[in-house]
Amino acid sequence: MFETVIGLEVHVQLNTKTKLFCSCPTSFAEHQNKNTCPTCLALPGALPVVNKEAAIKAMRFGYAVNANVNHTSIFDRKSYFYPDSPSAYQITQLSKAIVQKGELFIDLEDGSQKRIGITQAHLEADAGKNMHEGNYSKVDLNRAGTPLMEIVSEPDMRSSDEAVAYLKKLHSTVRYLDISDANMQEGSFRCDVNVSIRPKGQEAFGTRVEIKNINSFRFVAQAIAYEVQRQVEAYEDGVYAQEVHQETRLWDVAKSETRSMRGKEEAADYRYFPDPDLRPLTVTQEMIDEALVMPELPDAKVKRYVEELGIKHYDALVITSQKELAYYFEEMITQGAVAKTAVTWLTSELLGRLNKAGIEIENSPVSAKTLGELVAKIADDTVSGKGAKEVLDHMMENENRDIDVIIDELGLAQVSDDGAILAIIDEILENNQEKVEQYKGGKEKLFGFFVGQTMKVSKGTANPGKVNELLKQRLNS
């Protein structure tokens, strides 16, 4: 039996207005090489200046994960030769990162939590972009110098499920902190996976393989599963030393397999040394105060939702998994929606319709205010639950319409007047005398028949609670 050992390196693109070491804008939609300057192009004499906003965002992350935020950190040069790096080095942090020794807690299927250590989070500059067309290549340096925060975990994960849970928690955290849009498809949240296996009980780690630049949670799980199986088979076949090397591999989406990219470099291969153009980054009290201003994070929200709003722990996890979902839920509550009912209508009714239509919650045609009002109207018996579903369907197709107008137009206003409901009940009982006698003779299952007939005649608008109450009065009199 083998134990899987997983560590993750996540590159988060910080949502600053300008690049890490110059004042060029960070937008990529511009014409190629438009957002560049002598610093981006590594022209002689151009000197870097640290982006204060990027440092504060990294610090805010550090405080959020209970890490040590170093008041002095060092920038280093990482030497390598690629066309998308005109300086032939990357400015990063190796010797002393701005954030060290943090932690993140993931939720396991059994309801417990597991601590995942964070070795460090450091600032570094992104490279440009190579574009290959036919038999020639072009380089776009608009992206060069964009601020990245690389978050390095401890090798604390033991399965692909734990790795994905950690990634999702990390993704959620940086979005709540508003330090990155963390768009995986656009590359602003990308992951390198380090995988090894070892016989259970063995302390020494096996040979570590790195899988580069995976941009979806699903692909992370698939890549880990494939790589673990490859290493296990090599071990069992007695060819582990020959086939499993410390190397960098790529995840081939089309073939659903990892394939060798290059031998894994060690730190010495990159010839790291302190950047002579940058003084140590010194944190001021003003920067600390600004970094400590942060929103309520997912774990705190879960605790509050469970303890104060009385919703289930699982439901709280679902709602807080996305910042937009949590804010939507809270807006529903401010509109008078009961928390437990709001959970059902948000996670089942609305999300079900949005998923079917391929719409994200932030683009929902039904606002949180509107859905909150609708749920409140169910509670005060203005409309039945069944009728409210029709109203929601209508709102999905017709934005910004008044709920009361929709209820009136569709004839869905719930009838709670005793007299109106009794009139319907009396008519039904009069037309079904034989069944009334059977009910009174002991066939109590017929009660459901009378309820159904009443709801049918009222076209679903009669208050179900009132119908049950008044029917019992009539049948038992």
Curated annotation (Swiss-Prot):
GO terms for biological process: glutaminyl-tRNAGln biosynthesis via transamidation; translation. The keyword Nucleotide-binding applies. SUPFAM superfamilies: GatB/YqeY motif, Glutamine synthetase/guanido kinase. Its EC number is 6.3.5.-. Pfam families: GatB_N, GatB_Yqey. Coiled coil: none annotated. PROSITE patterns: GATB (PS01234). The keyword Protein biosynthesis applies. Gene3D superfamilies: 1.10.10.410, GatB domain, N-terminal subdomain. It catalyses: L-glutamyl-tRNA(Gln) + L-glutamine + ATP + H2O = L-glutaminyl-tRNA(Gln) + L-glutamate + ADP + phosphate + H(+); L-aspartyl-tRNA(Asn) + L-glutamine + ATP + H2O = L-asparaginyl-tRNA(Asn) + L-glutamate + ADP + phosphate + 2 H(+). One of its GO terms (molecular function) is asparaginyl-tRNA synthase (glutamine-hydrolyzing) activity. Keywords: ATP-binding, Ligase, Nucleotide-binding, Protein biosynthesis. Heterotrimer of A, B and C subunits. Allows the formation of correctly charged Asn-tRNA(Asn) or Gln-tRNA(Gln) through the transamidation of misacylated Asp-tRNA(Asn) or Glu-tRNA(Gln) in organisms which lack either or both of asparaginyl-tRNA or glutaminyl-tRNA synthetases. The reaction takes place in the presence of glutamine and ATP through an activated phospho-Asp-tRNA(Asn) or phospho-Glu-tRNA(Gln). NCBIfam families: gatB, PRK05477.1-2, PRK05477.1-4. Belongs to the GatB/GatE family. GatB subfamily. This is Aspartyl/glutamyl-tRNA(Asn/Gln) amidotransferase subunit B. It comes from Sulfurovum sp. (strain NBC37-1). The gene is gatB.
